[in-house]
Amino acid sequence: MAEVHLRETDVIYVLEGTATFVTGGTVVDGRPTAPGEIRGTAIRDGETYRLSKGDVVIVPERLPHWFTEVSSPFLYFVVKPISQGGDSR
């Protein structure tokens, strides 16, 4: 599921497996699912990266992102620092 976090950064560390990771572009059929969270079915016009064991990705708040073409198993660890102030658009 494609998503955008309005106040969270994702720091992703891949532990095992491979996946295609898409960032940027526009979330297709995006809808709010929780405060500060938008999810959709895909991303249109994003940039594509191939991730594998040992890769680290930092996804800033407000940047659409999506895992696709995911191997099994695909294991990753994510830390989500949350923005505490400023604009809450």
Region spans (language model):
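A short hydrophobic beta-strand segment most commonly corresponding to one strand
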Residues: S71-S88
